[in-house]
Each structure stands twice: as C-alpha cells, then as structure tokens.
C-alpha cells in the first residue's frame, strides 16, 4: 500500500512518505476496523486525512448535517447555563444545582424526541440497542448469538438501510452487519445500496461502509461497485474523501482487468462511457491513430495529475498508474513540465511499481539540469530509496543515465558511507552496488528487470552522452574504496550473512575494481584478505566456527581458486589484474590457518573437506604447494571416506 502522509501547505511531505513507505503487505488507506468501535472514532480521520490536522475534527463534527445538529443541541447546555448564571447574578438570585440538572435532563429529552421524529428514527433507536450487544468484542460473542443478533438487525433495517448509511452511528451499524453477515446477505446489502455508492464514497462516514463492502464483498459485488463508480473516478480523485476510496479500490480490491478499466477513464469521458468498445486498446495504439485524440487524452491525464498533486495525493498508486500512461505518450516539452510539477515530491513516486516506472522514465528523459533537481529531491531519502523493492530500480537508473558521476557520488555518498553495511546484506539494497561491480549481470538481475533497465538506458541516449561502461567505471573508482573500507571495518558481521559473503566475493574477485584502485587502496585490499583469513582461525570442532556456514566455505573456496567460474566452459577463468588471490592466498591459508597439525581434521570434517580439495587443485602444480602436498601425502592413509563426507571421498580419489 502506498504510504500515507498528511497534507502540508497543500502538498504532502515527501519526507513523511519516505519514513512510512517500508512494507511487505499492502495496507488500506481506510482501515477496515476504523469505525467499528467508539474508541476508534478519535483516530479514524487521522488514518485517512487528506488535508490538515484541523480537518480531522471538522470531518467528525461538521461533515454530516444531522451529526452537527446533534452536537449543537448538546452544546447548548453550556452556553445556556452560562447565560442564565449571568442573569441571575444581576437579579441577585442563586441557581440551585438541582436546577442545572433539570435543565440538562430537559434538553436531552428534547433531543431524543427530535431524533425519534426524524425519518426511521424509531427503527434506528431499536437497531442501535441490538447493535450495542452485537459489537461487543470482549469477551467474544458465541457464533450462534452473533448470528441471532445480526438477523435481528437485518430484519429491523432492511427496509430503511438507505436511510442509515450516511449517518454517523447508524453507518457503523451497517458496517458491523456487513462484517458479521453471510455472503448472501452482503449481496442483499449491496443490492439495497445500488445507486448510492458515489454518495457513500464522498461521505465522511459512508466511505467506511463502502470500503467494508469492498473488503468483505464477493467479486461480483465489487464489480457492481466499480461499474457504478465508473464515469466518476476523475471527479472522485479530486474529492477529499473519495480519493482514498478510489485508491483502496485500485490497490487492494480490483483485478487486473478492473484496474485497466479504471485507468482508461482518466483518458477521457469517451473511454468512460464506451468502455466495452475500447476494452482491448492501449494508449499507444489510440494515440497513433489520431493526433487529436492524443492531445485530448494527454490534456485529460495531465489535468487529473496536476489537480491530485496540488491536493497532496502524489503518493497514490492509482495516480502513479495515470502518470505512467501519460509519460508513454508525452513529448519532450511535456516531460519537462512533468518534472517541474513533480520534482519536489519525487520521492513519493518510487515505492510503487507504476511510480517507479514513471520516475525511471523521467530520469532517463530528463536533461542535465532536470536530473540535478531530481537528485536534490532524493538526497534526503537515499536510504529508503536504495532499500525499497522499486526504489532501487530508480537508483540504478540514476547510475545508468546521469553523466555527472561526481554529482551522483556527492549526493549519495554520505548515506552510502553510513549504511553500506546494511545495503550489502539487503535483498534489494545490494543491487545498485552489484550493478556498479558487474553491470547488469544475469546472476543478480532477472530478465524482466534487466530488460526494463535496458529500456531506460535506450531512452536516455537522447540526453546522456557518456558510454555506459565509462560511466560505470567512473562510479566504480569512486565507490570501490568505500566498499573496501566497509568490509575491512565490519567483516566479522558481514561474513555471518549469505548475501554479505556473496558481495565480498564479487568485490574481491573483480579485475575491473582492482584496476581502479590506487596504491593505498590496494594495500587496503590486501588487509581485507588478511581479515578474512583471520576469521577462519580456531578450532573447527566448535559449532560457531565459520567453516560450518556453507556460504562462508564458498567464499573461501572462491578466493583459493582466484578466478571467475565460467558455467559454459565449466572451469575457473583466472583474473588478470588482482594480486593476492589464487596461489598466494592458498599458500597463506595453509601456512597461517590450517598447517600440518590441523590438516587431517580439516579433511575428515564434512564442512571443511572441500576447502582442502580446492587447496589441492590450486597448489598441486605449484612450487609454493610442495609443503602442503608433502603433509597431505603424510596423512593420506588416515583419510576417512564415509558417505557423509563427499569432500574427503573426492580428495582420496584425486590422490590415487
């Protein structure tokens, strides 16, 4: 679910979006349980506020005229009491406490009589008395009692349900009924409310009922609601209450086909009215067929986008979907205007798939000046951007497309330096750095992601001048020392993570990176190797020894081999530039960590035996390996070859 922010000076804060965006499951903007209980009344408007904090109280006290009248009646008592006190002081009379109580009682009686005289007033009071028993959560009601009370409420309300749904307490009654009713009864409620869904969507109280109907309703009832709202979505997107209903409908409840139906409405009224005729059309096909249609669609889309952004709805996923339609057909001038409109709230785009696509397209098609504005807007959100499932794609696109690598490094390096340890062990946070190290390697970038990034690179060719490889090498030369410093400082914790070991291997077994290092950084590189060796010291019979972690063993084996494994040729390709891996590392590992006293123990341990196999394959034809081979022959007869130790079996076979 897109993150929720409050409106500030007509626009929602990008910072608030950044702080609230982390999520694994989409959450509704309008809480399903927000208005079931009185205790939640005080926070239900906070949960969906689309304007200022003052609007929260306004919504509860003034949005519904009858609720306002009730509140006014109750408030009369204080004003009346004060007025009477003043008069009595002038006349020298004392007002008794009993008189005050009598005044309150009289006013409440009058208020109750007025309520009873309203339409369905008697039924509402009867229904509320039953509802008070049904809505109890502690202790939970037995199922039979709950069904009995639900049936009783339905019998009392089925003929006047349309009179209940827009009233404060009465609306909550119907919400509870929807929550605890059977599928058939929910369908009946939906049928009873046909023709009122737009009114519900724009009501401060009715919107909660509408969201409950979407949440608990069947596929057919959702389609009924969508069909009725169709033609009004653009209007709802500009409405304070309605925008949140449309967003939840699009994100949480609509099918892919229904989403397409909803988005086409933003093209214009023609596509809202004749939706079946244009069912299979894409925006590109429509715009190719007629320049006039293209201009109308573009005008309608940017009108909705502009109004929603100014209202503070930039973070809405449905708006991102409309933006994606627009950027598909926008010319260079329109792209520039779009960037001007959005650059201050750019961080609000990156947390949804549609918004990420829009952000990447704008970055790719922007000129140097516009890219600078975008980078400035994202600077304070770098950590969230890089770790986000979709935000990291935007960041990689920036690395791919922005020629000013000095600006990129200057903008993001403070955050990267502080959080790099977290990034390299994060599923998404590590991808930008793997791109800098390896390019769009299929090992880390799926075909879908890779093709998307290649599409953005193609779009950027109109405004980006540098060769992509040159740009990547410039970034590598700037970030490589940071990689080494972080690994050298935090190697002990990084090596306990699978993704961390994988990243260290890609940093160390990398000719491109080593070629970018100066003499000082090369010394730091060797220090990292020494630190890794130190990690493997100790008794391998202890459970906490890193040799018992499969990913740590893979890293050690890769450093011993000193090259990149080629899956096609099924062999290790030696490195050309890197110093200290392969034979030197293997020799040092044996001399300083294993030695003759522990060799047999390493061979007969199932977790470490393949490390000895790697040592043998690397050192067998090298003069540096003579001490190792001599010691190996000395313990050959004591090697155990049981079924649980495949490594020792392989080693025994190689030694024959």
UniProtKB/Swiss-Prot annotation:
Residues 13-23, 90-107 have a biased composition (Basic and acidic residues). Component of the ASH1 mRNP composed of at least PUF6, SHE2, SHE3, SHE1 and the ASH1 mRNA. Interacts with SHE2 and FUN12. GO terms for cellular component: cellular bud tip; large ribosomal subunit; nucleolus; nucleus; preribosome, large subunit precursor; protein folding chaperone complex. RNA-binding protein involved in post-transcriptional regulation. Component of the ASH1 mRNP which transports the ASH1 mRNA to the distal tip of the bud, where the ASH1 protein is translated and targeted to the daughter cell nucleus. Binds to the ASH1 3'-UTR containing the PUF consensus UUGU segment and represses its translation. This silencing of ASH1 mRNA is critical for asymmetric seggregation of ASH1 to the daughter cell nucleus. Gene3D superfamilies: Leucine-rich Repeat Variant. The lineage of its organism: Eukaryota, Fungi, Dikarya, Ascomycota, Saccharomycotina. The keyword Ribonucleoprotein does not apply. This is Pumilio homology domain family member 6. Its main location: other. It comes from Saccharomyces cerevisiae (strain ATCC 204508 / S288c) (Baker's yeast). The modification Phosphoserine is found at residues 31, 34-35.
């Amino acid at each position: 679910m897109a993150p929720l922010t409050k409106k500030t000076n007509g626009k929602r804060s990008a910072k608030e979006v950044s702080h609230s965006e982390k999520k694994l499951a989409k959450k509704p903007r309008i809480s399903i349980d927000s208005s079931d209980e009185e205790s939640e009344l005080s926070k239900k408007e906070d949960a969906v506020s689309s304007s200022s904090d003052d609007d929260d109280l306004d919504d509860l006290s003034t949005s519904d005229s009858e609720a306002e009248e009730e509140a006014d009646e109750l408030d009369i008592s204080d004003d009346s009491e004060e007025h009477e006190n003043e008069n009595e002081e002038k006349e020298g009379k004392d007002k008794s406490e009993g008189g005050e109580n009598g005044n309150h009682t009289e006013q409440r009686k009058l208020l109750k009589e007025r309520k009873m005289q309203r339409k369905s007033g008697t039924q509402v009071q009867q229904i509320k008395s039953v509802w008070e028993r049904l809505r109890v959560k502690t202790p939970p009601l037995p199922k039979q009692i709950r069904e009995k009370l639900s049936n009783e409420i339905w019998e009392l309300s089925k003929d006047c349900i349309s009179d209940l749904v827009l009233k404060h307490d009465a609306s909550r009654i119907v919400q509870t009924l929807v929550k605890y009713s059977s599928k058939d009864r929910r369908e009946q409620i939906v049928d009873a409310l046909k023709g009122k869904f737009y009114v519900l969507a724009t009501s401060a109280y009715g919107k909660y009922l509408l969201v409950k109907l979407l949440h608990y309703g069947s596929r057919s009832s959702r389609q009924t609601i969508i069909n009725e709202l169709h033609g009004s979505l653009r209007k709802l997107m500009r409405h304070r209450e309605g925008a949140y209903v449309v967003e939840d409908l699009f994100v949480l409840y609509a099918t892919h086909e229904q989403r397409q139906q909803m988005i086409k409405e933003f093209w214009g009224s023609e596509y809202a009215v004749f939706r079946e005729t244009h069912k299979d059309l894409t925006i590109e096909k429509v715009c190719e067929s007629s320049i006039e249609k293209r201009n109308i669609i573009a005008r309608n889309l940017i009108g909705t986008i502009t109004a929603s952004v100014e209202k503070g709805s930039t973070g809405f996923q449905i708006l991102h979907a409309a933006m994606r339609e627009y950027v598909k057909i926008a010319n260079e001038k329109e792209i520039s205007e779009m960037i001007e409109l959005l650059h201050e709230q750019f961080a609000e785009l990156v947390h949804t798939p549609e918004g990420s696509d829009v952000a990447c397209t704008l970055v790719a098609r922007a000129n140097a000046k516009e890219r600078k504005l975008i980078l400035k807007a994202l600077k304070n959100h770098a950590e969230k951007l890089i770790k986000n499932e979709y935000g990291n794609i935007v960041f990689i696109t920036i690395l791919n497309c922005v020629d000013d690598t000095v600006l990129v490094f200057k903008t993001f390096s403070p955050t990267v330096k502080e959080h790099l340890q977290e990034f390299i062990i994060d599923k998404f946070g590590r991808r930008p750095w793997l791109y800098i190290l390896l390019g769009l390697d299929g090992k880390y970038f799926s075909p879908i992601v890779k093709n998307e990034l290649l599409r953005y690179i193609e779009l950027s060719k109109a405004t980006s001048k540098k060769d992509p490889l040159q740009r990547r090498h410039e970034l590598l030369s700037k970030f490589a020392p940071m990689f080494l410093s972080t690994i050298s400082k935090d190697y002990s914790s990084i090596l306990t993570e699978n993704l961390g070991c994988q990243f260290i291997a890609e940093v160390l077994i990398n000719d491109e990176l080593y070629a970018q290092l100066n003499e000082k950084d090369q010394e730091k590189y060797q220090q990292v190797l020494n630190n890794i060796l130190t990690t493997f010291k100790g008794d391998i019979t202890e459970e906490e020894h890193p040799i018992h972690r499969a990913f740590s063993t893979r890293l050690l084996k890769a450093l011993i081999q000193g090259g990149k494994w080629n899956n096609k040729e099924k062999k290790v390709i030696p490195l050309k530039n890197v110093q200290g891996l392969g034979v030197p590392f293997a020799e040092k590992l044996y001399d300083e960590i294993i030695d003759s006293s522990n060799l047999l123990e390493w061979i007969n341990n199932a977790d470490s035996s393949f490390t000895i196999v790697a040592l043998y394959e690397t050192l067998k034809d090298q003069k540096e390996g003579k001490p190792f081979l001599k010691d190996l022959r000395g313990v050959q007869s004591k090697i155990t070859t049981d079924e649980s130790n495949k490594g020792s079996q392989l080693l025994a076979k190689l030694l024959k």
